[in-house]
Amino acid sequence: MHFFDEDTRQFWGPAGSEEEAYASIEKLDDNAYYIAYASLEKLTSYAHFYNWAKNREMDANLWCAVYTSDEDGYMCDSVPVGMLINPSGSCIDWDRETYPYLCQLDNRADTDSWHISEDTEKMETHFISLLSYLRDHQEIVKILNGDQEIPYDTMIESVKQDGLRIYGFSIVCQKKKLLQLWDEEGISYLYAVPLD
């Protein structure tokens, strides 16, 4: 999470100021892998974000943070929520009517499902199904988040009303990619932790 220091007029994140975050990236090992966390300067539509990532050959193993808001427009107070944008998961059996595209690879015989990431409407359906499934299966949520109350219905309504709005992402990469990302317009903060 970020916070804005009114006195210094700087944003601070997990790695400190922007300058401190950049300095920490410069010190990384060239050959090691890291989990990079990036915040975007502004909310971005899923379609725009996907195309941006694909043009940079980052559309594989990329997790995007989805912004959901309450009826007053404030970000839902909960754990960060998001999704992988590339087809992932295995084809398991579930109620496809209640949770369409719960698994992006809904039907292995359907080669179109390999391109689901390019279809904003299907990705919205996928994300809504993920949230709905978690809402309806609290035993999974308890394992992940204990007894924390998560406003799934509010999040679902937000996506239905405003679509998928991306505010950040995470990717596994090496130092070279981190330095390239640092130079990208549209990224407001970037830091990395070693991949263990």
Where are these regions (language model features)?
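Extracytoplasmic beta-rich ectodomain segments of secreted or membrane-anchored proteins
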Residues: M1-Q104
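Arginine residue identity/basic-tract feature
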Residues: R9, R56, R96, R108, ...
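Extracytoplasmic/luminal low-complexity segments enriched in Pro/Gly and acidic/polar residues
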Residues: D119-D196
